[in-house]
Amino acid sequence: YYRSKWAQLDLKSANQLLDDMGLVKRDSRGIRLLPDGKPLNLIIETAGESTEQTDILELIHDSWLKIGIKIYSKPSQRNVFRNRIFSGETAISIWSGIENGLASANSSPAEFAPTTQQLLQWPKWGQHFETGGKAGQNPNDPFAMELLKLYRDWRAEPIFAKRKDIWEKVLDIHTEQVYSIGLIAGVLQPVVVSNNLKNVPIKGIYNWNPGAHFGIYSPDTFWFKTLPTNSMER
């Protein structure tokens, strides 16, 4: 449910949503016009570290153009990218997404609430939480405030079943409010392994936190059937 809620390609509904917002006028290119008469151009900023994100944006560009939105990708460097977001100069950005690909009731839901400045959809709110109110901005969105409350409730709750209930409420809010737009999930990660290296699983979950990529499969139990000929060890 959470993964597929807004994942369907429905240009008719997307156009209707934009019409309902009052963005009915278009220029000669078919790009919708904002209330001030300017075309609806979106500059999506990236950290410029990989062509994967710009390739994805090229695919999105063609779909969004059909509903009257023109997007441009703007690569930069990570420190510049983050500082622009932290200072509120960025309209929209693209990033790698949620770290926790193995969420359970006992996993922290911190990534789904404004708990840190590093969460790029709400840096000022996250900074406010991180600094105990000394910097940033106090959330003025009731749903974001509820997410923070649920996060605190989860931290104080020792019972697994109640933690699970809290997680479901967090995901319900996060899904309905769409604080970030999910693009891809469950991408296959090919891994090349020597036939000489044994005890490596054929299939697995490739996730950094939790999981540490290969760490979850105890790489200390991997072993070479024969010693590589170019090994310095004898």
Language-model segments: which ranges?
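Detector for C-terminal structural segments
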Residues: Y1, L11-Q16, E52-D62, R82-R234
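Short, well-ordered beta-strand elements within core beta-sheets of diverse protein domains
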Residues: W6, I71-S73, R152-A156
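Short helix-initiation/N-cap motifs at beta->coil->alpha
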Residues: S73-N83
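Short alpha-helix C-terminal cap/hinge motif
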Residues: I60-K70
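Short, well-ordered beta-strand elements
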Residues: P39-E49, I71-S73
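Acidic/polar loop patches that form or flank catalytic/metal-binding clefts of enzymes
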Residues: V24-R29, I69-P75, S93, S180-L183
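A mature extracytoplasmic/lumenal domain signature
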Residues: T46-G48, P75-Q77, A185-V187
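Immediate post-signal peptide segment of exported/extracytoplasmic ligand-binding proteins
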Residues: Q8-I43
